[in-house]
Amino acid sequence: MSFQDRTAEFQACVTKTRSRLRTTTANQAVGGPDQTKHQKSEFTRIAQKIANQINQTGEKLQKLSQLAKRKTLFDDRPVEIQELTFQIKQSLSSLNSDIASLQQVVKGNRNKPAQMNQHSENVVVSLQNSLANTSMTFKDILEIRTQNMKASQNRTEKFVASSSMNANPLINSGNSISPFADYNDPKPEANEDYLSLNLGDGANTRYEQMALLESQTDTYSQQRMSSIQNIESTITELGGIFSQLAQMVSEQRETVQRIDMHTDDIVSNIGSAQREIVKFYERMSSNRALLFKIFGIVIIFFLLWVLVT
C-alpha cells in the first residue's frame, strides 16, 4: 500500500488562508475608523450648521430689538418688524426640528464608543440650551413690542379725542352765543318757512378734516390690532417650541445625571490618588537612609556593568 505525502499542499493551503484572513482583518481595520470618522464628521457638520443658524438668528434678534424699542410714531417701521418676526419664527421652528433630528441620530448610534456618545449628547444639550435662550429673548422682544404698540395706540386715541373736542363747534363752554349765528344772513319774512342752517365754509372744512382724521385713525388702529394679534399668536407658537424643548431636555436629564455621577467619581478618585502620593512622598522623605542605600546600589551596579563591558 503506497502513501502520498501532501504535507506541502496542506502548508500552502494554511498559508493562503492566513493571508486571506489577514487581508480581511486589515480591510476591516482600515474601513472601521474611516466609517467612524465619516459619521463623526457628518454629526459635526450638522451641529456646526445648527450653531451657525442660531448665531444668525441672534443677529436678527438684535436688529429686531432695536426696532421694537422705538416708541415714537415717526420712527416706527412695522413692515420691517413684521418681516423680521416672520423670519425669526421660521428659523426657530426649523432649528427645533433640526435639533430633534440630531437627537434621533445620537440615539441611533448607541453602539458607538461611550466617550463619543457622551460628547454627542453634550453637544445636543448645548444646542438645546442655546435655542431655548434665543426663543426666550425673542419672546421678551415681542412682549416689549406689544406694550409699546398698545401705549402708542392709547396716545393716538387720546389725541384724536382731544382734537375732536376742540374742533367741535357744539362743544364750546366759553361762549353763550350760538356759533352758528350769522348776522349777515337774511331774516325770515312773515309767514315764511325758514329751515336752512348755515354752518359757514370754516365749519364745513373742520368737519371734513375731523372725518378724515377719524378715518385714518380707525385704519391705523385696525392695523395695530392686527399686528398685536399676530404677535400674540407668535408668542403662542413659541410656547409650543418651549414644550418640545422641555420634552427633549427631560430625555437628556438621565444622561446629564449619569455624567454628573461619573464626574463625582473622577474627582473622588483624583483626590484619593493625590492623598496616596502625598503619603508616599512623606514616607520617602522621612527615610533618607534608604534613599542613600538605593542610590549606592545603583552606582555599584553601574560601575560593575562598565567594568564588565
From Swiss-Prot:
Which residues are exposed on the Vesicular face of the membrane? 309
One Gene Ontology CC term in the entry: endomembrane system
* Domain t-SNARE coiled-coil homology, residue spans: 218-280
- UniProt keywords, alphabetically: Coiled coil, Golgi apparatus, Membrane, Protein transport, Transmembrane, Transmembrane helix, Transport
Per its UniProt record, what SMART domains does this chain match?
A: t_SNARE (SM00397)
Which residues lie toward the Cytoplasmic compartment? 1-288
What residues form the membrane-spanning segments?
A: 289-308
Bilayer topology reads: Single-pass type IV membrane protein
List the GO molecular function terms.
Answer: SNAP receptor activity; SNARE binding
Sorted alphabetically, the Gene Ontology BP terms of this entry are:
endoplasmic reticulum to Golgi vesicle-mediated transport; intracellular protein transport; vesicle docking; vesicle fusion
Could you confirm whether the keyword Ion transport appears in this record? no
Where does this polypeptide localize? Membrane; Golgi apparatus membrane
Residues folding into a coiled coil are 37-66
Task: Report which superkingdom the organism of origin falls in.
Answer: Eukaryota
Q: Return the InterPro entries for the record.
A: SNARE, Syntaxin, Syntaxin-5_N, T_SNARE_dom
Task: Give the CDD domains listed for this entry.
Answer: SNARE_syntaxin5
Give the record's family classification: Belongs to the syntaxin family.
Q: Could you tell me what this protein does? A: Required for vesicular transport between the endoplasmic reticulum and the Golgi complex. Acts as a target organelle soluble NSF attachment protein receptor (t-SNARE).
Name of the protein: Integral membrane protein sed5
State the encoding gene. sed5
